[in-house]
Amino acid sequence: MALVAGIDSSTQSCKVVIRDAETGALVRQGRASHPDGTEVHPDAWWSALQSAIEEAGGLDDVAAASVAGQQHGMVALDENGEVVRPALLWNDTRSAGAAADLIAELGGGEKWAEAVGIVPVASFTLTKLRWLARNEPANAAKVAAVCLPHDWLTWKLSGSTDIADIKTDRSDASGTLYWSAKTNEYRRDLLELGFGRDLVLPEVLGPTGIAGHLPNGAPLGPGAGDNAAAALGTGALPGDVIVSIGTSGTVFVSSDVAPVDGRGTVAGFADTTGRFLPIVVTLNAARVLDAAAKLLGVDHDELSRLALSAPAGADGMVLVPYLEGERTPNRPDATGAIHGLTLKTSDPAHLARAAVEGMLCALADGLDALVAHGAEANRIVLVGGGARSEAVRRIAPALFGKPVLVPPPGEYVADGAARQAAWVARGGDTPPAWSAASPEVYEDDPVPLIREQYAAAQNAVIDRTR
């Protein structure tokens, strides 16, 4: 039995799955936590990866491995391959001003969307490089190469110390602001616009490219950004829109068309198969449920029970969930807000319901944006930690207006990386067709009132800088 390894280095933790390359059956797995924060030294990821690999029984017997990970994080290296400073992660919004400046300098969002498929916001890598150049010039002067979290971990696994050997894949490169998914080329002119000079950048590999080898000689796949890996790991069919409710919320679908959205709502990323992955991202997803549970002093099961005990629309109470600023819409300094607080709605059930509906309304807005840019949307595949909430599962169909499928809980990002590794080991034009467990299906009639209430309230928020 040939084995493959899939690695997911996420914001919170590192997961390693070892699967049968032919069937996809899980053989063993490991996990280790990452430190909190929006600024983390990559050595912490490497330490967690080693712990997770050890818990998973090692990689000596695998035929191939691939690493997927959180996107956009700026890993800045000097000429010797040493980390210059802790990585600024996707959820670090200090570069919001840099993003606004970059939009203006190129002539507007439409110019960026046409050039690289995405419009600058604080999440994307180039904005962090601009922030570094302006705010830490001594560190900026040391930078010889820049890469992303999964690139760096793959490079470390290969044993190389030469920055010229760093590799990446289309999906992760497409979130940098200096690589075009449409042309499959770097835009070094945009890198120089943002950072002031050129840098060594990872080679961008195709779906089955080899990024290096493990000590046992097994090939390392190109890896992927977390959302692209999740799309591969769920085995989504054409027209299946994946809604992932993790730290961030993501709505995405594989497509043959690269969207161009000058407003920046829909990001024109690439997927793991040579196609495109239009995606809408919100900064506030499962953390909204965490915050509501904390505020009410209950666990998540009780939060779900409370939410389902209140009527649809929460009798007019609306929670706008911009708890840590927001990326979609682009409001990095916004705060959350509760509207419609009356004597009737002043109880835990209404607040719980408003929290679930507010989070889902933000994601439903993302679905609308994908469809407006040509995406096919037949069903919703709901994954991530937030999908474990019974309230989320039962309320979602009324907001999305489509059947909602919930696969069994799993490590879909790591599974996608493992499936890619099996593809690299086997070769061929398509990834292996692994069998999957049947999902639970939830259906309900749409309730337009909920979306209408949210639309009326979402612009009435307070800027945290005032």
From Swiss-Prot:
Q: Cross-referenced PROSITE patterns, in alphabetical order?
A: FGGY_KINASES_1, FGGY_KINASES_2
**What molecular functions are annotated in GO for this chain?**
ATP binding; D-xylulokinase activity
Q: Where is this site: Important for activity?
A: 8
The Enzyme Commission number assigned here is: 2.7.1.17
What is a single Pfam family found in this protein's UniProt entry?
FGGY_N
Q: Which GO terms describe its biological process?
A: D-xylose metabolic process; xylulose catabolic process
What are the catalytic residues? 226
UniProt keyword terms in alphabetical order: ATP-binding, Carbohydrate metabolism, Kinase, Nucleotide-binding, Transferase, Xylose metabolism
Q: Which reaction does it catalyse?
A: D-xylulose + ATP = D-xylulose 5-phosphate + ADP + H(+)
Positions with a binding annotation for substrate: 71-72
PANTHER family linked to this entry = SUGAR KINASE, XYLULOSE KINASE
Purpose of the protein: Catalyzes the phosphorylation of D-xylulose to D-xylulose 5-phosphate.
User: What protein family is recorded?
Assistant: Belongs to the FGGY kinase family.
Q: Which NCBIfam families does the entry mention?
A: XylB (TIGR01312)
Its name, as the record gives it, is: Xylulose kinase
Organism of origin is Actinoplanes missouriensis (strain ATCC 14538 / DSM 43046 / CBS 188.64 / JCM 3121 / NBRC 102363 / NCIMB 12654 / NRRL B-3342 / UNCC 431)
